[in-house]
UniProtKB/Swiss-Prot annotation:
It catalyses: tRNA(Ser) + L-serine + ATP = L-seryl-tRNA(Ser) + AMP + diphosphate + H(+); tRNA(Sec) + L-serine + ATP = L-seryl-tRNA(Sec) + AMP + diphosphate + H(+). The keyword Chloroplast does not apply. Catalyzes the attachment of serine to tRNA(Ser). Is also able to aminoacylate tRNA(Sec) with serine, to form the misacylated tRNA L-seryl-tRNA(Sec), which will be further converted into selenocysteinyl-tRNA(Sec). Disulfide bonds: none annotated. This is Serine--tRNA ligase.
């Protein structure tokens, strides 16, 4: 059974180095894995040869006369002793080899732009008519026409209020100050209409995807170390996720983690593929690398709700399914009437699991920037190798690793920030997207057409 990265390591290690270099990672990772794999195969061959000789001798011993039988018994014992010693060495090398293999990132797809960071990301399409404040025209052009796109926009002469101020000081429906006192930075209290909006967004995404045939899943919110290290590069990202003290458990940063583990250590008949799931869960993130970015508001927070798409696929179908996943996300944001662009992520910004990644970024009028709302990845067989998830081909009962894909559908708090900036009005109200209204109607107190500022109570 072949794993694409191991196959390339053995067939063309120099080409695998080029893929590692595209990610601006140390190519000596390949040298180390290649050396250990070579040594592992050498020892494995020796162990197999000794085992074969031992089996031949053991089979023939009963047929031999003395003293030849005693000599052969001693020879078999000696072979067994040598084999046990070699197997011990083999296990040591095997552990080191596996550790080295798991450090290798995925093979970069040929359509991925090469560059060290997000400044090399390439927009591939735009949708909607953004509201652009007159003071942001130049930077809007930098994010559109620079890439050869002529995007129609609506010029506004009043500067929209940022989502953080809109939430706390205009609508007065959030409180990050009190949350900071009791829980720390990047936490929040949300109230009334914003909570209804959060729930409606989740219902909207769930309704849309289950209508398309995706199986709804409420997954575990915690995973064991063995599983979490199969889903992500845990050695690199251990400071980005929360560990439960005294327990072999980690809080998930996305339902992707639990959905990837759903078929861990299983074999899936090819006729059952693709398996399409939509998971809904809270997400917990340390945001350790965020520094002082987005400290205000609820754009980058430690906890939020998210609806996630996850697919198990045949390798020959995974690239078409990646387009389906990003298409599903685009349908959701079109329904919300939030102008966006889809971006092909640069090689240095992919993260180890992804062979290719798209981000969907909505226009944020108060910032004059497109900001990430959705991340969609094809991880090919990177996760499935680590989690031992295989497909079984009907013809010849051949086994191989499945391809897995994931994509955000809706991350509620981040999507709320986009709604607050894009759908605000000069009088301080926020127009509720039409597609959400039927999900709000089930609540007697939920907003229908507009979210209004809460009137300040008199002292």
């Amino acid at each position: 059974m072949s794993w694409s990265i191991l196959t390339l390591l053995r067939d063309n290690p120099e080409l695998l180095k080029e893929h590692v270099k595209k990610r601006f990672m140390d190519p000596s990772l390949v040298d180390e894995a290649y050396k250990l794999d070579l040594e592992w195969r050498r020892l494995l061959s020796q162990v197999q040869e000794l085992r074969h000789r031992h089996n031949v001798i053991s089979r023939d011993i009963s047929k031999l006369p003395e003293p030849e039988r005693s000599a052969r018994i001693n020879e078999a014992r000696e072979l067994l002793s040598q084999m046990e010693e070699l197997e011990k060495k083999l296990k040591e090398i095997e552990d080191l080899r596996e550790e080295a293999l798991l450090k290798l990132p995925n093979i970069v797809h040929e359509t991925v732009p090469v560059g060290p960071d997000d400044t090399y990301n390439v927009p591939i399409r735009f949708w909607g008519k953004p509201k652009v404040w007159s003071g942001y025209i130049e930077q809007f052009m930098q994010q559109t026409e620079r890439y050869g796109f002529k995007v129609e926009y609506e010029l506004v002469n009043w500067k929209p209020v940022g989502h953080a101020d809109m939430l706390e000081y205009v609508l007065r429906l959030g409180d990050t100050v009190k949350a900071g006192e009791v829980a720390g930075s990047r936490f929040y209290y949300l109230f009334d209409d914003i909570v209804f909006l959060d729930i409606a967004l989740l219902m909207y995404a769930i309704d849309s995807l289950t209508s398309k045939g995706y199986k709804l899943v409420l997954p575990p919110y915690m995973l064991r170390h063995k599983v979490m290290s199969g889903v992500i590069d845990l050695a690199t990202f251990k400071d980005a996720i929360y560990k439960i003290e005294g327990e072999d458990l980690y809080l998930i940063a996305t339902a992707e983690h639990s959905l990837a583990a759903l078929h861990a250590f299983e074999e899936i008949p090819e006729e059952e593929l693709p398996l399409k799931y939509v998971g809904v869960s809270p997400c917990f993130r340390k945001e350790a690398g965020a520094g002082n970015r987005d400290l205000k508001g609820i754009f980058r927070v430690h906890q939020f709700h998210k609806v996630e798409q996850y697919v198990y696929a045949k390798p020959e179908e995974s690239w078409a399914l990646m387009e389906e996943l990003i298409g599903n996300a685009e349908d959701l944001f079109k329904g919300l009437e939030l102008p966006y662009r889809v971006v092909n992520i640069a090689s240095g910004d992919l993260g180890a699991p992804a062979a290719k990644k798209y981000d969907l970024e909505t226009w944020m009028p108060a910032q004059g920037l497109f900001r990430e709302m959705v991340s969609c990845s094809n991880t090919t067989d990177w996760q499935s190798y680590r989690l031992k998830t295989r497909l079984v081909r009907r013809k010849g009962m051949v086994k191989e690793y499945v391809h897995t894909l994931n994509s955000t559908a809706i991350a509620s708090t981040r999507t709320i920030t986009s709604i607050l900036e894009n759908r605000q009005n000069e009088d301080g109200t926020v127009t509720v997207p039409r597609v959400l209204r039927k999900y709000l109607e089930v609540f007697n107190k939920a907003p229908r057409d507009y979210i209004h500022p809460v009137k300040r109570e008199r002292a």
